[in-house]
Design a protein with these regions (language model features):
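Donor nucleotide-activated moiety binding/catalytic core segment of transferases
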Residues: 90-105, 255-297
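Membrane-proximal basic amphipathic "stem/tether" segments
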Residues: 1-47
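Catalytic binding pocket for nucleotide-activated donors in carbohydrate/polymer assembly enzymes
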Residues: 264-267, 294-363
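C-terminal amphipathic helix plus adjacent low-complexity
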Residues: 1-6, 10, 337-382
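Active-site and donor-binding regions of nucleotide-sugar-utilizing enzymes
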Residues: 40-190
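A donor-sugar binding/catalytic signature common to diverse glycosyltransferases
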Residues: 106-129, 275-319
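A short, charged/proline- and glycine-enriched loop
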Residues: 33-42, 121-123, 207-210
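Conserved catalytic-core segment of nucleotide-activated headgroup transferases in glycan assembly
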Residues: 52-61, 183-263, 335-337
Length: 382
């Protein structure tokens, strides 16, 4: 039901406008009667779905440094019962909005105000966002005009490209740009061969196998927001015949995907969607296969081969849109068919493709090391 309501708000401009005006007014009035707690920090990751990403990196930093022990950290989740060791509140409930009005510090990778505008004077808002965008986001998506980050005090950017995108997509203020990169990606810089080997061991990968991480992005709902299914045109039995002697595949669906159709898991194709830390999977992987996901930019930090399997590119381009043509920028252009993808993997020149990935990384990512500490100091002033 919650997903359905969110879908309606996103896709019905009239209902969205009424909701935004009325509820923003209600919460602004409520805010007049709720005193700000200078030691309360509200965290939200992926709209309350997970305990991960850059907000978790910031939280972990605060827990590890004595100077931040005096802060009370509250996490908002869709299902707080999954996180018994954290202080939590259920997102999109009256208690959540009271907490948001009370907390002096907001930290998220999506949004805190839930499409509304009720931030009070003196509250500090850090939005890391959750990746560099290939596909249109925010107000750049057809039919959307509801993103307004003018209340965000600090917005993480990875480079000049992000700054251009966020200006149109979010109406972000240039003064809010925190030019530090993403805290979640900090551990991907300078990964050693020993760390890679240890991660593969933790994941149970045989020593004689290479790892392909396949991580497609989500697709828009076809049933009015009831579900977000994905059925990639993939025949993993053929992949096994062609690649099984040398590789294993880790299949990771986007967090917003509700169901993966047509995929049978075994020793060759392993389910990785439920694994909590995507960075672990990237560290272990020798090759990334994706499509329009921000994971391509994250993985590029490792300077390893990337393949773009854009089987529905023409349709996706028409329905969603992208900021640039994949074949103009991606390190290995794109593959439109399964046969082409398998052929390229079998013929890969690892060194050449790694160099191509580095050029791709350097075009889009200018900042990254020290991101977590920089975010904490910007938000808390110490």
């Amino acid at each position: 039901m919650r997903q359905r309501l969110i879908y309606i708000l996103k896709h019905n401009a009239a209902i969205q406008a009424i909701y935004r005006i009325v509820m923003s007014f209600v919460f602004r009035v409520m805010g007049l009667f709720i005193k700000t707690d200078d030691n309360l920090v509200l965290f939200v990751s992926f709209m309350g779905l997970n305990f991960n990403d850059s907000p978790k990196a910031i939280y972990d930093y605060m827990q590890a440094h004595p100077g931040y022990k005096g802060y009370r950290c509250m996490w908002a989740f869709e299902d707080p019962s999954k996180f018994p060791n954290l202080e939590t509140v259920k997102i999109d409930t009256p208690a959540y909005f009271r907490t948001a009005l009370k907390a002096k510090y907001w930290i998220t990778n999506t949004n805190i105000e839930r499409g509304l505008h009720f931030k009070k004077k003196g509250q500090k808002y850090l939005n890391t966002w959750h990746g560099i965008a290939l596909k249109y986001i925010g107000n750049d998506v057809a039919g959307r005009n509801d993103f307004n980050f003018d209340t965000v005090d600090h917005l993480c950017v990875c480079g000049d490209y992000d700054e251009r995108v966020y200006k149109s997509a979010f109406r972000a203020k240039e003064s809010s740009y925190l030019r530090v990169g993403l805290p979640r990606n900090e551990e991907l810089w300078n990964v050693t061969d020993e760390e890679k080997a240890e991660m593969r061991k933790r994941l149970g990968i045989p020593a004689d196998k290479k790892v392909i991480l396949y991580a497609p992005t989500w697709r828009e709902s076809t049933d009015g927001g009831k579900s977000y299914e994905i059925k990639p045109p993939i025949h993993f039995d053929e992949w096994k015949k062609e690649l099984g002697d040398e590789y294993v595949v880790l299949f990771r669906a986007h967090h917003q995907t509700t169901k993966v159709l047509g995929v049978q898991y075994d020793e060759f194709v392993r389910e990785a969607s439920s694994y909590p830390a995507v960075n672990d999977l990237m560290i272990a992987a020798d090759i990334l296969i994706t499509d329009y996901s921000a994971i391509a930019f994250d993985y590029s930090i490792l300077c390893r081969p990337i393949f773009c399997y854009a089987y529905d590119y023409d349709t996706y381009l028409a329905e969603r849109g992208t900021y640039f043509q994949i074949d103009d920028k991606y390190p290995n252009k794109s593959c439109r068919t399964e046969e082409e993808l398998l052929s390229r993997i079998k013929e890969i020149d690892y060194k050449t493709e790694s160099m191509n990935t580095k050029r791709f990384r350097d075009e889009f990512i200018q900042y990254g090391i020290g991101a977590t500490e920089a975010c904490v100091k910007a938000e808390f002033g110490k």
